[in-house]
Amino acid sequence: MADRPQQLQVHPQRGHGHYEGGIKNQRGGGPSAVKVMAVLAALPVGGTLLALAGLTLAGSVIGLLVTSPLFIIFSPVLVPAAIVVGLAVASFLSSGALGLTGLSSLSWVLNYLRCASQSLPREMDQAKRRMQDMAAFVGQKTREVGQEIQSRAQEGRRT
């Protein structure tokens, strides 16, 4: 590896020397006919939309100027009415939420009881078997202890 000569190749890049601002010069030097037609078509549409936006803004300002005194005059009625409507909507929504919570709780309880009633006979049989096994175990231990007491009593008589 060390005895091989190493070569460096340089490839110059052309055409990327400076930034042109995203505009490429065309052969004709001016905008194309398609671009001119697009601008001419967009000007009336844009102007119309701008005029409609101005009319809408003017109408909104005039409407606000006309209705502001009415809002001030009727505010003793409107504010409590808005509060009542807000409370009614809030109570309706909370009633629905509590109703859904109650239904889901009831569904859970019924499902729990259904599962418990299906497993109850099996659990009762298991408990019965455990009690019988425990009674047999206690009886066996009682016999063993009784025999142990008898054997010790007989040994005590002999001595």
Swiss-Prot record:
<keyword id="KW-0551">Lipid droplet</keyword>
<dbReference type="Pfam" id="PF01277">
    <property type="entry name" value="Oleosin"/>
</dbReference>
<dbReference type="GO" id="GO:0050826">
    <property type="term" value="P:response to freezing"/>
</dbReference>
<dbReference type="InterPro" id="IPR000136">
    <property type="entry name" value="Oleosin"/>
</dbReference>
<keyword id="KW-0472">Membrane</keyword>
<feature type="transmembrane region" description="Helical">
    <location>
        <begin position="70"/>
        <end position="90"/>
    </location>
</feature>
<feature type="transmembrane region" description="Helical">
    <location>
        <begin position="45"/>
        <end position="65"/>
    </location>
</feature>
<feature type="compositionally biased region" description="Polar residues">
    <location>
        <begin position="1"/>
        <end position="10"/>
    </location>
</feature>
<feature type="region of interest" description="Disordered">
    <location>
        <begin position="1"/>
        <end position="24"/>
    </location>
</feature>
<feature type="transmembrane region" description="Helical">
    <location>
        <begin position="92"/>
        <end position="112"/>
    </location>
</feature>
<dbReference type="GO" id="GO:0016020">
    <property type="term" value="C:membrane"/>
</dbReference>
<dbReference type="GO" id="GO:0019915">
    <property type="term" value="P:lipid storage"/>
</dbReference>
<protein>
    <recommendedName>
        <fullName>Oleosin Cor a 12</fullName>
    </recommendedName>
</protein>
<dbReference type="GO" id="GO:0010344">
    <property type="term" value="P:seed oilbody biogenesis"/>
</dbReference>
<keyword id="KW-0020">Allergen</keyword>
<comment type="function">
    <text>May have a structural role to stabilize the lipid body during desiccation of the seed by preventing coalescence of the oil. Probably interacts with both lipid and phospholipid moieties of lipid bodies. May also provide recognition signals for specific lipase anchorage in lipolysis during seedling growth.</text>
</comment>
<comment type="similarity">
    <text>Belongs to the oleosin family.</text>
</comment>
<keyword id="KW-0812">Transmembrane</keyword>
<dbReference type="GO" id="GO:0012511">
    <property type="term" value="C:monolayer-surrounded lipid storage body"/>
</dbReference>
<keyword id="KW-1133">Transmembrane helix</keyword>
